[in-house]
Amino acid sequence: MGATTDHALGRNLRFFCKKEAAAGGAYGTASQEALAGADAAKVLSSSMEFTVTRNDRMDARGTRSIQERITGKQEVSWSCESYLLPAGSTTAPDIDPLIEGAMGGAFGASTAKTYKLSDSNALPTVHMARTANDVFREDLFGCWVEEMSISASGGEEPKISFSGGAFNYVLTGTGTTEGTGSSATSLVTESGNGVNFMVGSVISFNSLADKIVTAKSTDTLTIASSSWSDAQAITPTTYTETTAGNPLNGIGGSLTLNSVTLPVTAFDVTITNGVKPLSDAAFEKGTSDFIAGYRSVKGNISVRARKDFIKSLAQRYVQTTATAGPSFSSVPIRVDLGSVSGKQVVVYVDTAELDFAAIDVPEAEEAILNIPFTALATSGGGDEIRIAWNQ
């Protein structure tokens, strides 16, 4: 907040995410799916990017200057990062909708407090929003998760991050009512204020909240029947956050590779869904559906090149003679994050094939073994990785 005019401040950002009942969340309609304070999640950072392709008109025009442009497809992308925040008991993490969106399996659906992968094409979609200081609100509808990563290094706090795309984007600013309304559906704003609102904006005025803009014409917004007086502030709706959990520290936990505990310097694992957005259909402004492609689960372990740890790298490749075909090692990996019982996050990769990377040897300091891996599923599929919460 500035001295005379409100500013959006990162420290006041509120982030919300909710699994959609139907893909796209009924965007821009009177039944658009709503958010609430219970959908809040704490994030370290977030990004929402909206672009619309504008192509220069390229036919003959008698001048070297560009005089006209043509509208192309819209594209929406997003990312966010959070601490790992287990809350204990059977409470799902606040970021649960995004984990389920990445993995497909719900919290505790098969095994209590454990996320598992799903081979379904119908990965859940998420309605996501962030608000700041009554200055602006951004909403994304039909969010899919392309990547989810869990990482830890040194003594830093372990983190979870997500990225993906979405069907639709809405930016909501502020305005002021022009005139009064009684059980009216056309909310007139002061001249020039209309640009601060889009179809799908969720606004508050006259002690009313969650009013959805279903259409807009210059400075007139179409909303559900409402009443208001003149010169009232119109602001983006926000909610009082309800969140749970405390960050895991980076000094408690362990990693075992093939039953050997390693004092790792870094660890990460990433689920990539191979999502194909269906954005190439004619007569569509952007993406209205997607197909989940081949999934990969890959990661990396870094550990100092101590004499007794060389075998952790060497076991990736075994050759019995100079001409014999090699065999490749598949080993289990378990990562325990946190040390307080009931508030740990445990990552299980039951079958990991160790991949290849160079040993990092600096000029004077200790060498580092980099051990990349690819998680493999059994013949049934869908069991490359499990993530257990509140252990």
Give names to the regions the model predicted.
Residues M1-Q391:
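Signature of extracytoplasmic/envelope-associated structural regions
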